[in-house]
């Protein structure tokens, strides 16, 4: 499954990107609420769903320290996520948030771990993956690769997962993990429509073509 990351600054931008993502072959849509210039986030989610008739919409409000744009109060962020969950099929919750059980979304959850510095050892990654899976409906483990050994390690974590798992490595040298992870059983991968939201991210069209070629 290809999840297109939508990074529009306005609701109109989000809708335009959503339509483009569907045309490029996306299977699901991630609405990056932290990119919106206003807080009318429920309306943005509804607009994306209505314009595409998509059944799979992911709501993400990523805080700055995890690569997002949200700089506001954390309690406010969690309040927003809980509220907008009624308009989404999945809400992305960071592992530390899920562990504290502060909020109870009314949809399924992707419990995520992001490491922008490195890729931890295999056993540590497996522990993180399993904890994410225990707390959510889908586990997501994303790390920064400093070489191919790191990339292969994250792929092994995906390959051996028993629960639905998203996993890949960031960085130019490891961009292939975004495609290979799906081919070896990963639940999904993320792709850009225009503006890339993470290091090494491919576009929806690039991802789809590679999956068709290699699959």
From Swiss-Prot:
It catalyses: 3-dehydroquinate = 3-dehydroshikimate + H2O. Pathway: Metabolic intermediate biosynthesis; chorismate biosynthesis; chorismate from D-erythrose 4-phosphate and phosphoenolpyruvate: step 3/7. It holds the Pfam family DHquinase_I. It is an enzyme of class 4 (lyase). Its EC number is 4.2.1.10. Belongs to the type-I 3-dehydroquinase family. Involved in the third step of the chorismate pathway, which leads to the biosynthesis of aromatic amino acids. Catalyzes the cis-dehydration of 3-dehydroquinate (DHQ) and introduces the first double bond of the aromatic ring to yield 3-dehydroshikimate. This is 3-dehydroquinate dehydratase.
């Amino acid at each position: 499954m290809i999840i297109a990351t939508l990074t529009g600054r306005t609701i109109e931008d989000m809708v335009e990107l959503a339509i483009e993502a569907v045309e490029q072959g996306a299977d699901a849509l991630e609405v990056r609420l932290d990119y919106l210039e206003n807080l009318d986030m429920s309306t943005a989610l509804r607009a994306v769903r209505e314009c595409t008739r998509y059944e799979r919409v992911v709501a993400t409000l990523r805080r700055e320290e995890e690569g997002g744009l949200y700089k506001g109060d954390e309690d406010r962020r969690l309040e927003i996520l809980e509220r907008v969950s009624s308009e989404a099929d999945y809400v992305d919750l960071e592992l530390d948030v899920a562990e504290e059980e502060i909020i109870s979304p009314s949809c399924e959850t992707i419990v995520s771990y992001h490491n922008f510095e490195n890729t931890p050892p295999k056993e540590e990654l497996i522990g993180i993956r399993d904890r994410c899976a225990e707390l959510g409906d889908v586990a997501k483990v994303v790390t920064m690769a400093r070489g191919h050994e790191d990339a292969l390690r994250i792929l092994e974590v995906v390959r051996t997962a028993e629960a639905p798992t998203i996993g890949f490595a960031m960085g130019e040298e490891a961009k292939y993990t975004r495609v290979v992870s799906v081919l070896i059983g990963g639940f999904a991968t993320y792709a850009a429509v225009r503006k890339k939201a993470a290091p090494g991210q491919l576009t929806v069209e690039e991802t789809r073509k590679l999956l068709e070629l290699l699959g």
